Amino acid sequence: MKKALIAMSGGVDSSVAAKLMLDAGYDCMGATMKLFDSDDILMAQREKTCCSLSDVEDARSVARRLGMPYQVFNFKGDFKEKVIDKFIATYEAGGTPNPCIDCNKCLKFDTLCRRAITLGYDYVVTGHYARIDCVDGRYRLRKALDDKKDQSYVLYNLSQEQLAHTLFPLGELHKDQVRAIAEENGFINAHKRESQDICFVPDGDYAAFIESYTGRHYPPGDFVDTQGHVLGRHKGIIRYTIGQRRGLGLALPAPLYVCKKDPESNTVTLCPNDQLNSTVVRVTEFNWLSIAAPAEPLHAAVKIRYNMHQAPCTVEVLPGGDVQLTFDTPQRAVTPGQAAVIYDGDTVLGGGRIV
């Protein structure tokens, strides 16, 4: 009998994933990753995080109801080093990170997967909405059947070895079906609200989290236009992201948007909306997942942020391994630090970090 370790967040998706794996005949154990102490999170946010006591108890309740063992694993050190510290460093360098991608690669499908294998489990199972198949000996990551819930974008950075030890039982289901299964089985979290924010910054105030967590102060500096003329003062470079208009605190004759952040000069550059468009973007740390790196340029589709439609582009591998994307139609507010993930239909070809 194959054995599966279920990564349980306390939410409905991972709970139903556990139920489906048991129904499929797997020997299962539930596990929740403890990623940070609540003392590390602002007081007002503690009970909103995925590592709150209530979430652990929800996961434990479902595991008990399903009659499977359950453990909590302490991965705080790895999470701090590989996710939180990188999140902060990216903001300080002027980028806008996506820590969920790093958590998936480094924690769920690395640290947790290695723990699972050590304990004798064959697979790690999560409640992600995505699919995996294998063609000619190569694993492919594919979009979920439910396009509105698809999470393949945040999974592009997995390796072939990680895909080989991963199962996504929700990939063929829609969210309403998942909630119905939870309700039929009396799960305590059947109607639990989904988290839409970064787990360790659930209120979305990234700057406040960074200042509280590091104890550092990020000084004010100048807003400038594209010619370098000073337009006013900003409140610290970590408080802004590319494409932002609201919250600038400036009285301007026409709308301006953040188009560049320069940590060295501590300036934030503003421009009109029509100057936010990009035709070409460079992507680094590229992970070719479902195919090997192509020798010739190829035409594909790309997502440059989580909640966007795919945009057609030409993909070219550069000397050294970086990738250049040339959009068929200019794209607005391409943001350094975010992921660019390329698709062929519903298959994830690969992705990397925008520079």
For every predicted segment, state its role.
Residues M1-Y156, L167, D176-Q177:
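ATP-dependent adenylation/nucleotidyltransferase module used to activate substrates
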Residues V125-I132, G137-V355:
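AMP-forming adenylation/ATP pyrophosphatase catalytic core
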